[in-house]
């Protein structure tokens, strides 16, 4: 699917080669990252918006597609967010996109300069439309070095933007922000890698706090499904069949890039005790949103048991319990009948070598 780019601009944040960070003038942020006020950064501002060319639209389409595939968190603006105040002036047409982008670039540079990991980057701001929804995309992209061969077959060094691998980006659903100011999901951001807090400064730049938690929502959904089956007095086999229906629906939504719609999900599974699942979930107050971003790792537990520890990793389909796999709680054992062929082959070869 294509996107429609309305406005786009690039600015640069440059860390001069001579910039030094004194080791004795650092302090710890709340997130445990080293911060400093002495990182020297320069902001190079483009003097006009980029023309909306085929190249600009392709550039933004690739960024959009890459962002869609990222693991994202959800956020909301803080009351005193300077970025949100500037954005509001833009949306109220009190300022234009270019001066808004200047404010944002300077604000980002000021926030980034506090950190020891500050590096150069290209700051991208783009307002675009996708599936009848207006978005503001914001990212800080790294440049990579490479080589190219010209028409004379001469080799030259070049720089290119790394638009497939980036960690510092956010997107604001302007349509949602306009029609539902109390939404807890109009802002999305890339969740940083485990153990890294580099992306946190970007949230500080935006003046945003985390909003909707997809992991918690998925866990609450699983609990609601389990309770629904229990209240319906289903057998273990019947419960597992319902859970598989839920998993198949959720898997389909993931593959389509869509969210879990609670009402739609409710229509795909049996009605128990004359009460649809959606009504049951609302009545029991699980705190579920009408639309839930699916988390694949959490949803797997609908159809699988898995665990690891002390050098052992086990994963099997839930429907095999009490059929081929038996659990003895008192003895703390699992008995497996019918080992996987490749595992059995490895064990037989080991036994043969020992003999």
From Swiss-Prot:
Q: Which family does it belong to?
A: Belongs to the YejK family.
Checking Pfam families in the record gives:
NA37
Question: Superkingdom, according to UniProt?
Answer: Bacteria
Q: Does the keyword Cytoplasm apply?
A: yes
Single GO MF descriptor: double-stranded DNA binding
Query: Quick one: where is this thing mainly located?
Result: cytoplasm
What taxonomic classification does the UniProt entry list for its organism?
Answer: Bacteria, Pseudomonadati, Pseudomonadota, Gammaproteobacteria, Pasteurellales
What name has this protein been given in UniProt? Answer: Nucleoid-associated protein MS1911
Q: Which NCBIfam families match?
A: PRK00378.1 (NF001557)
User: Residue ranges of region Insert?
Assistant: 21-40
Q: What UniProt keywords are attached to this protein's entry?
A: Cytoplasm
Q: Which GO terms describe its cellular component?
A: bacterial nucleoid; cytoplasm
> Subcellular localization, per the record?
Cytoplasm, Nucleoid
């Amino acid at each position: 699917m294509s996107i429609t780019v309305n406005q786009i601009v690039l600015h640069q944040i440059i860390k001069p080669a001579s910039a030094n960070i004194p080791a004795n003038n650092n302090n710890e942020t709340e997130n445990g990252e080293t911060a400093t006020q002495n990182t020297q950064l320069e902001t190079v501002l483009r003097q006009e918006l980029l023309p909306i060319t085929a190249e600009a639209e392709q550039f933004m389409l690739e960024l959009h597609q890459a962002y869609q595939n990222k693991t994202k968190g959800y956020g909301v603006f803080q009351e005193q967010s300077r970025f949100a105040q500037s954005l509001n002036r833009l949306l109220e047409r009190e300022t234009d996109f270019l001066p808004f982008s200047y404010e944002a670039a300077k604000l980002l540079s000021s926030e980034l300069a506090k950190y020891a990991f500050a590096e150069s980057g290209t700051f991208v701001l783009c307002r675009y439309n996708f599936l009848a929804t207006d978005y503001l995309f914001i990212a800080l992209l790294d440049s990579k070095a490479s080589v190219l061969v010209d028409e004379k077959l001469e080799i030259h060094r070049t720089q290119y933007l790394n638009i497939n691998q980036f960690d510092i980006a956010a997107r604001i659903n302007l349509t949602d922000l306009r029609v539902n100011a109390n939404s807890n999901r109009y802002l999305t951001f890339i969740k940083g890698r485990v153990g890294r807090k580099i992306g946190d400064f970007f949230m500080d730049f935006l003046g945003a706090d985390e909003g909707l938690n997809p992991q918690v929502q998925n866990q609450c959904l699983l609990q609601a499904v389990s309770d629904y089956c229990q209240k319906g007095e289903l057998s273990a086999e019947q419960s597992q069949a319902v859970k598989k229906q839920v998993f198949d629906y959720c898997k389909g939504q993931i593959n389509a890039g869509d969210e879990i719609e609670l009402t739609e999900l409710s229509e795909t599974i049996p009605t128990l005790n004359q009460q649809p699942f959606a009504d049951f979930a609302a009545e029991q107050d699980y705190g579920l949103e009408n639309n839930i971003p699916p988390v694949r790792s959490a949803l797997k537990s609908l159809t699988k048991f898995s665990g690891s520890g002390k050098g052992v990793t086990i994963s099997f389909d839930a429907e095999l319990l009490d059929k081929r796999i038996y659990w003895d709680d008192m003895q703390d054992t699992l008995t497996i009948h019918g080992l996987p062929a490749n595992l059995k082959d490895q064990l037989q070869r080991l036994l043969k070598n020992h003999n």
